[in-house]
Amino acid sequence: MSVRQSLFAAAVGSIVGSIVTLAASPASSQVLRYANQGDLKSLDPYTLKETTTIAHHSHVYEGLVTRDKELKIVPALAESWETLDPTHWRFHLRKGVKFHNGDPFTADDVMFSAERVRATGSNFTSNIPPDAKFVKVDDYTIDVMLDSPNPILIAQWDGWLIMDKKWCVENNSVAPTPASATTPSYASLHENGTGRFFIESHQPGVKTVFKINPNWWGKSETNLKEIDFTPIASAATRVAALLSGEVDVIEPVPIQDIERVNASGTAKVLTGPELRTIFLGMDLSRDELLYSSVKGKNPFKDVRVREAFYKAVDVDLIQKRVMRGLSTPSALMIAPQLYPLSNEFTRPKYDPDAAKKLLTEAGYPDGFELTMDCPNDRYVNDSAICQAVVGMLARIGVKVDLLAQPKQQYFAKVLKPGGYKTSFFLLGWTPASSDAHNVLHDIMGCRNDEKDPTRGEANLGGYCNKDIDTLTDKVLVETDAAKRNQLIKQAFEIGIKEYSYIPLHQQALAWGVSNKVKLTQRADNEVLLYWATKQE
């Protein structure tokens, strides 16, 4: 096992930068200072479908719909809607809304955003079904025409945020900024939304300052005038900043520090189950792995190798040692809260001896070498989980070179814009629609850019079974809940039989919050501070 040593220098630089920034942040009942382990990569709301990034963007941009504190879909820039028939939706847009630069919000912005979000470079193409045709009825009415019924259409739109057409055109930002971009676009460094806050300044890797939007169309639920966001990669520095009062909110709190924060008398940890599933994936599409000692073929195309990896991973040990009990081992690629038949599935037992035998049968009695991609500032104890997996695979003869990177570099490498450059990886997924269809379509769907560029968009390893695609299409249009759940079950059963992925667990939420602050914690782990209040 080897973790790239360059990470140390990057981490030190991040810590030093964070300390300098914090010292300059004002302490006030109207200023909330928030720190996260990861940075805000881009202000372009279509660059990265990642919970922390979406939460940041949702302070300044808005969608036609949004989710309330209980995760229910509610109106936002669309004040109402109705279905004229099962394939014809009509949306009535909110009048009198202004973008932060004063431009009026109209149907033209929705039409533009519907095209931009589906354009090359967007990480949100699957949020809008490819058969959806947008028609402008008038300046404040939009029709959406579908080829077939879609009862979860507006749930799929969660995370799709509306942009100002005029502003994008004027600033050469008609095309979305891909996650793999090495040169920032205007939209990646500036924002112009309709949301409750606007961004006064943005220094990537250092600090982003949000200011309250006095012209927001809705009724504010916060007493905040400013939010100062600072990325602090170091867990120890992040916790120290909370306990010293330098910041008011941190996410996540390291599991080992939860008791200390709760005992501090100045802060507490908000915990709860998260809807995110953490899992391992393998490159199943290439004929030869990009990063492996095996040449001329791909070991993962043999189901015995995939089964061996699955049975070599001890999720109970990860739960006990790495997650300190704050995780729930999973047999599925979806949280049990989102699928009622989850309890009908069980994980294959941890069995390293059987795993070793399977590798031998597959022609790898001495194992092989490969590289594992892992973020080190995205999920709870993500790098530690990967290190544990490396040790477990070593027991069956597989030598893993662990490449643990900050999420900016990680996602730029492994996502679609970067060419899915990974052989073995750790990822987390919360279905934006809070529905199993999202998992089957985005994570387990066959990639086919020519036929449907949205299917399998987040399927980094290229797993493909056409029977799952057929079932997924039936799931989308089925309105009978019992029949729909059975279709979902059939699809998951196929994926499990083929060892398409290795689900690990649902992680627990852990937000560190000053006793001066009250906020709402949702199970999707979006830190939405426009509901927060602070008292000195």
Predicted feature residues:
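N-terminal signal peptide c-region/cleavage motif recognized by signal peptidases
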Residues: S18, L22-A24
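Bacterial N-terminal signal peptides that target proteins for export
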Residues: M1-S14
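Mature extracytoplasmic/periplasmic domains
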Residues: R324-F345, A510-S514
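N-terminal lobe/hinge region of extracytoplasmic solute-binding protein
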Residues: A35-D85, E115, N192-T194
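Long beta-strand-rich cores associated with HINT superfamily self-processing modules
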Residues: W511-E536
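Surface-exposed binding/hinge segments that line
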Residues: E82, S126-P176
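Extracytoplasmic/periplasmic ligand-capture domains
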Residues: T66-K69, E82, P86, R94-T125, ...
